[in-house]
């Protein structure tokens, strides 16, 4: 296998990407194509499933051919994907019965509220690790069955298939032969029992979803089948599947209990490996399956922050304070601190661990001396404060003190932000040389399944440090900063409470 590579397919919310990795875990080739976001009504978000497939197949071929290679050079394919996004298709024709309903879509929020009012939240959380929310796949499937003419009848006859994006891609890559998913994607549907690792009959009955629609659930690293499409002339093993954040956790080599990664993107996604037992959160985090390799199942706690890098985009597009996102570090560095200014970027409410949908963005502590530099610094600081809130909840739930934070995503390139994050945490923030950890995780899962890499120790040894940020702020100053942030969050919540 000297001249072979692993192809990682990274199907995201706004684009489909493909990357070729060599045996040392280096990126050899990359291709990307954006696709259309469909907004039929306020709060609704859809994708065209055929466009998801065509863009993903297209970039897969492009990543290979632009290096002068062909399908015979690909040892295996690993897939990672936007999670929860729901596709239902006709088994006979292979055609979707409706657009993909995206994870951001809120059309089933009222139905979720009615389930909560029936007192079902504790039961659902105990089985799935998830709160009842329109974010997850279950109520999206139910909506399609209730609103697409003929869908429920076809589903009862076993003629419809449901899948998250990974299932849809495998179905198409195998010319409609394989209907599978992996445990990580299944664990985000709100239909999968994370303890028994099976589809939950009681939840299926509760939501009136026929079991015949659901894919077979497999490990995250095994040979599921082989490609049969015209994208590649040769048959390539499909050998790794994981949801995007799970793949990033694996790509960061957070393979032992207590290891944590934070992906700094438009929002932040923090995930902690909690070992071979699920931990039920008492602090509004999500319990999920991290991955499964062979019989070894690892679990995780996850917290999502809605607005992280998006606050920088707001300073650029909404306020005109900067012309490009990259300018924020230099602007913020003009001042040593925010001079008491706090920005709570609750533009879409507050995510974990607060879960306050009504909170709104607020700026506190502004004086006549406040400048655009103070505001820029407050925006960066807010990303670190929000991350600390989630990490504190993770420590409380798990009883594990975090040893270091592994960071990736676009905003992890901001050295000022990473230093402040380390200062607040009191432990090192470490940035790897390869920050494309999501695709790398999918590649590792696929490569391990076929013996391209011998074992976990071999891939672990490939993780390489780019830069380590060690805490340097005095503890008393950290305490003062945190007290101000907590006061600002309380004030943002109070502003949203119109009963006061």
UniProtKB/Swiss-Prot annotation:
<comment type="pathway">
    <text>Polyol metabolism; glycerol degradation via glycerol kinase pathway; sn-glycerol 3-phosphate from glycerol: step 1/1.</text>
</comment>
<feature type="binding site">
    <location>
        <position position="17"/>
    </location>
    <ligand>
        <name>ADP</name>
    </ligand>
</feature>
<feature type="binding site">
    <location>
        <position position="83"/>
    </location>
    <ligand>
        <name>glycerol</name>
    </ligand>
</feature>
<comment type="function">
    <text>Key enzyme in the regulation of glycerol uptake and metabolism. Catalyzes the phosphorylation of glycerol to yield sn-glycerol 3-phosphate.</text>
</comment>
<dbReference type="InterPro" id="IPR018484">
    <property type="entry name" value="FGGY_N"/>
</dbReference>
<feature type="binding site">
    <location>
        <position position="410"/>
    </location>
    <ligand>
        <name>ADP</name>
    </ligand>
</feature>
<dbReference type="InterPro" id="IPR043129">
    <property type="entry name" value="ATPase_NBD"/>
</dbReference>
<feature type="binding site">
    <location>
        <position position="84"/>
    </location>
    <ligand>
        <name>sn-glycerol 3-phosphate</name>
    </ligand>
</feature>
<feature type="binding site">
    <location>
        <position position="266"/>
    </location>
    <ligand>
        <name>ATP</name>
    </ligand>
</feature>
<feature type="binding site">
    <location>
        <position position="135"/>
    </location>
    <ligand>
        <name>glycerol</name>
    </ligand>
</feature>
<dbReference type="InterPro" id="IPR005999">
    <property type="entry name" value="Glycerol_kin"/>
</dbReference>
<protein>
    <recommendedName>
        <fullName>Glycerol kinase</fullName>
        <ecNumber>2.7.1.30</ecNumber>
    </recommendedName>
</protein>
<dbReference type="Pfam" id="PF00370">
    <property type="entry name" value="FGGY_N"/>
</dbReference>
<keyword id="KW-0808">Transferase</keyword>
<dbReference type="InterPro" id="IPR018485">
    <property type="entry name" value="FGGY_C"/>
</dbReference>
<feature type="binding site">
    <location>
        <position position="84"/>
    </location>
    <ligand>
        <name>glycerol</name>
    </ligand>
</feature>
<keyword id="KW-0067">ATP-binding</keyword>
<feature type="binding site">
    <location>
        <position position="414"/>
    </location>
    <ligand>
        <name>ADP</name>
    </ligand>
</feature>
<feature type="binding site">
    <location>
        <position position="309"/>
    </location>
    <ligand>
        <name>ATP</name>
    </ligand>
</feature>
<feature type="binding site">
    <location>
        <position position="245"/>
    </location>
    <ligand>
        <name>glycerol</name>
    </ligand>
</feature>
<feature type="binding site">
    <location>
        <position position="244"/>
    </location>
    <ligand>
        <name>glycerol</name>
    </ligand>
</feature>
<feature type="binding site">
    <location>
        <position position="83"/>
    </location>
    <ligand>
        <name>sn-glycerol 3-phosphate</name>
    </ligand>
</feature>
<keyword id="KW-0319">Glycerol metabolism</keyword>
<feature type="binding site">
    <location>
        <position position="13"/>
    </location>
    <ligand>
        <name>ATP</name>
    </ligand>
</feature>
<feature type="binding site">
    <location>
        <position position="15"/>
    </location>
    <ligand>
        <name>ATP</name>
    </ligand>
</feature>
<dbReference type="InterPro" id="IPR018483">
    <property type="entry name" value="Carb_kinase_FGGY_CS"/>
</dbReference>
<dbReference type="GO" id="GO:0006072">
    <property type="term" value="P:glycerol-3-phosphate metabolic process"/>
</dbReference>
<dbReference type="GO" id="GO:0006071">
    <property type="term" value="P:glycerol metabolic process"/>
</dbReference>
<comment type="similarity">
    <text>Belongs to the FGGY kinase family.</text>
</comment>
<dbReference type="InterPro" id="IPR000577">
    <property type="entry name" value="Carb_kinase_FGGY"/>
</dbReference>
<dbReference type="GO" id="GO:0019563">
    <property type="term" value="P:glycerol catabolic process"/>
</dbReference>
<feature type="binding site">
    <location>
        <position position="135"/>
    </location>
    <ligand>
        <name>sn-glycerol 3-phosphate</name>
    </ligand>
</feature>
<feature type="binding site">
    <location>
        <position position="410"/>
    </location>
    <ligand>
        <name>ATP</name>
    </ligand>
</feature>
<keyword id="KW-0418">Kinase</keyword>
<dbReference type="GO" id="GO:0005524">
    <property type="term" value="F:ATP binding"/>
</dbReference>
<feature type="binding site">
    <location>
        <position position="244"/>
    </location>
    <ligand>
        <name>sn-glycerol 3-phosphate</name>
    </ligand>
</feature>
<keyword id="KW-0547">Nucleotide-binding</keyword>
<dbReference type="Pfam" id="PF02782">
    <property type="entry name" value="FGGY_C"/>
</dbReference>
<dbReference type="GO" id="GO:0005829">
    <property type="term" value="C:cytosol"/>
</dbReference>
<feature type="binding site">
    <location>
        <position position="309"/>
    </location>
    <ligand>
        <name>ADP</name>
    </ligand>
</feature>
<feature type="binding site">
    <location>
        <position position="14"/>
    </location>
    <ligand>
        <name>ATP</name>
    </ligand>
</feature>
<feature type="binding site">
    <location>
        <position position="13"/>
    </location>
    <ligand>
        <name>sn-glycerol 3-phosphate</name>
    </ligand>
</feature>
């Amino acid at each position: 296998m000297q001249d072979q590579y692993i192809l990682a397919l990274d199907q995201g919310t706004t684009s489909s990407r493909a990357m070729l990795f060599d045996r040392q875990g280096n990126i050899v080739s990359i291709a990307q194509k954006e696709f259309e976001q469909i907004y039929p009504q306020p709060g609704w978000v859809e994708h065209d499933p055929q466009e998801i497939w065509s863009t993903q197949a297209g970039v897969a071929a492009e990543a290979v051919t632009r290096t002068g290679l062909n399908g015979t050079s690909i040892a295996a394919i690993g897939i990672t994907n936007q999670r929860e996004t729901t596709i239902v298709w006709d088994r006979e024709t292979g055609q979707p019965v409706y657009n993909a309903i995206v994870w951001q879509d809120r059309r089933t929020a009222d139905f979720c509220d009615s389930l909560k009012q029936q007192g079902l939240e504790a039961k659902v959380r105990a089985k799935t690790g998830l709160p009842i929310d329109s974010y997850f796949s279950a109520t999206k499937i139910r909506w399609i069955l209730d609103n697409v003419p003929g869908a429920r009848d076809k589903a009862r006859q076993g003629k419809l298939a449901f899948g998250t994006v990974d299932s849809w891609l495998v179905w198409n890559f195998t010319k409609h032969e394989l209907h599978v998913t992996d445990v990580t994607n299944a664990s985000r549907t709100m239909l999968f029992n994370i303890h028994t690792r099976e589809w939950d009959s009681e939840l299926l009955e509760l939501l009136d979803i026929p079991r015949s629609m659901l894919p077979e659930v497999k490990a995250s690293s095994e040979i599921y089948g082989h490609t049969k499409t015209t994208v590649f002339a040769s048959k390539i093993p499909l050998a790794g599947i994981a949801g995007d954040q799970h793949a990033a956790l694996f790509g960061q080599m957070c393979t032992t209990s207590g290891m944590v990664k934070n992906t700094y993107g438009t929002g932040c996604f923090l995930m902690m490996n909690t070992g071979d037992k699920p931990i039920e959160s008492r602090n509004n985090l999500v319990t999920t399956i991290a991955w499964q390799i062979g019989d070894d199942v690892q679990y995780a706690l996850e917290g999502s922050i809605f607005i992280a890098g998006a606050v920088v985009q707001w300073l650029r597009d909404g306020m005109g304070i900067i012309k490009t996102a990259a300018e924020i570090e230099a602007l913020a560095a003009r001042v040593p601190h925010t001079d008491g200014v706090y920005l709570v970027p609750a533009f879409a409410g507050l995510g974990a661990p607060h879960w306050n949908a009504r909170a709104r963005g607020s700026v506190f502590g502004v004086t006549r001396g406040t400048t655009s530099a103070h505001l820029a610094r407050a925006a960066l600081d807010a990303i670190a404060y929000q991350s600390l809130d989630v990490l504190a909840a993770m420590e409380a739930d798990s009883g594990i003190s975090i040893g270091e934070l592994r960071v990736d995503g676009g905003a992890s390139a901001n050295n000022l932000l990473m230093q402040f994050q380390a200062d607040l945490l009191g432990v090192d923030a470490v940035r790897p040389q390869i920050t494309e950890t999501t695709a790398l995780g999918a590649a590792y899962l696929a490569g391990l399944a076929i013996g391209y890499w011998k074992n976990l120790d071999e891939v672990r040894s490939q993780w390489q440090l780019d830069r380590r940020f060690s805490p340097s702020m005095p503890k008393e100053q950290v305490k003062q900063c945190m007290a101000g942030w907590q006061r600002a969050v309380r004030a943002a919540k109070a502003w949203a409470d119109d009963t006061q």
